[in-house]
Amino acid sequence: MSLIRRSNVFDPFSLDLWDPFDGFPFGSGSRSSGSIFPSFPRGTSSETAAFAGARIDWKETPEAHVFKADVPGLKKEEVKVEVEDGNVLQISGERSKEQEEKTDKWHRVERSSGKFLRRFRLPENTKPEQIKASMENGVLTVTVPKEEPKKPDVKSIQVTG
């Protein structure tokens, strides 16, 4: 039996995000016909949509940069927070498909499985080695501490003459 995924733009794991150019001759959507941009691979909107779907807020406080991501239904073991090249914060997650019993009869499938991946280039005034992440009630919070602003080194010069 084939399970049909629902389409919801607010679901971070949905593979069916709205494409405003879908249906136009120059559209990037998988259903567009006769694209005038043959170098764009057709059908990529649904394959990449799961990676673009995770909604993440980023705010800056005097002490830190704080990232908040809604990851409902994920366990902390299914979420990864990494730093690449010392200044790129990468937040990813994957919800696996549940084991399907062959004897079960499905009436509706609204919970989806899939992956998401988001990257953020951190400003220079951060301390990536002190990043902390926590998850509570389906919300991932990543805190990136900021460095203390350097005070200028002032040297007095004696005036002669």
UniProtKB/Swiss-Prot annotation:
**What are the sHSP domain coordinates in residue numbering?**
47-161
Note whether Nucleus occurs among the keywords. no
> What's a single GO MF annotation on this record?
unfolded protein binding
Indicate yes or no for the key word Cytoplasm.
yes
GO cellular component labels:
cytoplasm
What keywords appear on the UniProt entry? Cytoplasm, Stress response
Tell what triggers its expression: By heat shock, arsenic, azetidine-2-carboxylate, cadmium, copper, ethanol and hydrogen peroxide.
Annotated CDD domains: ACD_ScHsp26_like
Name the source's superkingdom: Eukaryota
BP term (GO), one: response to hydrogen peroxide
Q: Which positions carry the signal peptide feature in this UniProt record?
A: none
The compartments listed are: Cytoplasm
Among Pfam families, the record links this protein to: HSP20
Listed Gene3D superfamilies: 2.60.40.790
Query: Taking the first listed entry, what is the main subcellular location of this protein, grouped into a coarse class?
Result: cytoplasm
Give the UniProt family note: Belongs to the small heat shock protein (HSP20) family.
Assembly description? May form oligomeric structures.
Query: What name appears for this protein in its UniProt entry?
Result: 18.1 kDa class I heat shock protein
